[in-house]
Amino acid sequence: MKNVYPGVDDKMIDRTVNLLLNKRDGNGGFKKNPRALDSFGAADEDVTNAYIVYALSEAGYKDIAKELAAVEKEARKSGDPYTMALCANALYNLGENVRGDDMVARLINARGEVGFWSGKKHSITRSTGQSLKTETTSLILLALLKAQNPDVQAISSAVKFLVGARSGYGGFGSTQATILALKALTKYAEFSKRTDEAGTIELLVN
């Protein structure tokens, strides 16, 4: 939220983070509220844990090594592209680049020739179908862009799919899918402006 709107209260963010950290169960997971009334509270345990770790890492909090390891283990076991993508982004955010690259390599191998990825179950908001494809592909594109040696072909496939998933009204399906797609495409636009190596430009005037 802070990256989108600088006016967000830091104390509110800290309270939210502390609430999540206090929900740690000591085994690498987070305790869920059984009284949750919305789709965020209805996601499966592995999806919820992966999303919380991803969110905390995006916010810059690093004291979650145990939770990250648990999410990574479960993602490898399940082979679910959605949780693997959340895990890969968290790994990169926390400086675990080698482990992040390994997770990305697994995702690339799982893509096949279809040009997009989809989760095996549902997303944190219990999205399925086209929205799940868009959310998963967006998260994977974000991870691909963070890789130490970005796979240009995989990146291009993901971008092509996301651009094609946009509706005539400018959305990409569900609210969550639209947010992630816009974030991923914005990061791609920044990435595409980079040069491969440092250099100088000479301007010759005749």
What are these language model-derived features?
Residues 1-206:
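Large, well-folded core regions of big proteins
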